[in-house]
């Protein structure tokens, strides 16, 4: 998917990119590749691949679960790495107020510089493990939306993300193909942490055979105080 095809696909979903937005994606690609030479941010470096598997992939929730992206919504991105999905979402939806949580300082330095280069406002960077941030009252149950892309299995991911979602808000997981087993496996965790599965959408990225699953979970009750548990515990002993 080259930049022109990217723009065309977005227009099919009623997103007409301004010159500024086109330029932001172009700069994003350029800076990602530049920094990736000395900081390990991504294995995907070819322009068409970045536009498809990073940029387009990141914005699929906007047209799959568009109804939850209210103007001025607060969004927390857990383990964003090189800024996916939150930075592409922010470029397309500038009213979003974004908080990015990542445990690696090098990635956050990249993101800090990227945000400046792209001229983005209302983006906060938090250095820490999701388990610790989820127990911090500055962030716990404060967000309308929490996203995570390819971070961990649903049973683990729910414990990272749901404590950050405010009651009535949503957790959006961007997964690969055939996430059915993961969802079954993660059902207990969703219940325990106060979430309820609303929708699961399977899609294929355009001009490719790349299959994806998007999962939408609503926070229907508060997360018990003991969650998230200590850093490392959710991965070692997922809720079952």
UniProtKB/Swiss-Prot annotation:
Gene3D superfamilies recorded: Vaccinia Virus protein VP39 (3.40.50.150)
Entry GO CC: cytosol
Key words, A-Z: Cytoplasm, Methyltransferase, rRNA processing, S-adenosyl-L-methionine, Transferase
Cross-referenced Pfam families: GidB
Record: residues binding S-adenosyl-L-methionine: 79, 84, 130-131, 149
SUPFAM superfamilies recorded: S-adenosyl-L-methionine-dependent methyltransferases (SSF53335)
Main location: cytoplasm
One MF annotation (Gene Ontology) recorded for this entry: rRNA (guanine-N7-)-methyltransferase activity
InterPro entries, alphabetized: rRNA_ssu_MeTfrase_G (IPR003682), SAM-dependent_MTases_sf (IPR029063)
EC number(s) on file: 2.1.1.-
Subcellular location: Cytoplasm
HAMAP family (UniProt xref): 16SrRNA_methyltr_G (MF_00074)
Matches recorded under NCBIfam families: rsmG_gidB
UniProt record similarity statement: Belongs to the methyltransferase superfamily. RNA methyltransferase RsmG family.
Free-text function comment from the UniProt entry: Specifically methylates the N7 position of a guanine in 16S rRNA.
Protein name, UniProt field: Ribosomal RNA small subunit methyltransferase G
Species of origin: Lactobacillus acidophilus (strain ATCC 700396 / NCK56 / N2 / NCFM)
Gene for this chain: rsmG
């Amino acid at each position: 998917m080259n930049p022109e095809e990217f723009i065309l696909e977005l227009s099919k979903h009623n997103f007409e990119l301004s010159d500024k937005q086109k330029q932001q994606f172009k700069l994003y690609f350029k800076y990602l590749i530049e920094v990736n030479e000395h900081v390990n941010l991504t294995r995907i470096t070819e322009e068409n691949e970045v536009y498809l598997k990073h940029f387009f992939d990141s914005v699929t929730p906007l047209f799959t679960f568009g109804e939850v992206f209210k103007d001025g919504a607060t969004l927390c991105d857990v383990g964003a790495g090189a800024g996916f999905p939150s930075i592409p979402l922010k470029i397309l939806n500038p009213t979003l107020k974004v908080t990015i949580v990542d445990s690696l300082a090098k990635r956050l330095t990249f993101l800090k510089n990227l945000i400046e280069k792209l001229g983005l406002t209302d983006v906060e960077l938090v250095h820490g493990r999701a388990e610790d941030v989820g127990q911090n009252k500055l962030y716990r149950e404060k967000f309308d939306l929490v996203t995570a892309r390819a971070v961990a299995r649903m049973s683990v991911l729910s414990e990272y993300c749901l404590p950050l979602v405010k009651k009535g808000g949503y957790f959006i997981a961007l997964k690969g193909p055939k996430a059915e087993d993961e969802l079954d496996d993660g059902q207990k965790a969703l219940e325990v942490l106060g979430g309820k599965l609303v929708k699961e959408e399977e899609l294929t990225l355009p001009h490719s055979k790349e299959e994806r699953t998007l999962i939408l979970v609503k926070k229907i009750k508060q997360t018990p105080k003991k969650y998230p548990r200590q850093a490392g515990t959710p991965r070692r002993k997922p809720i079952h």
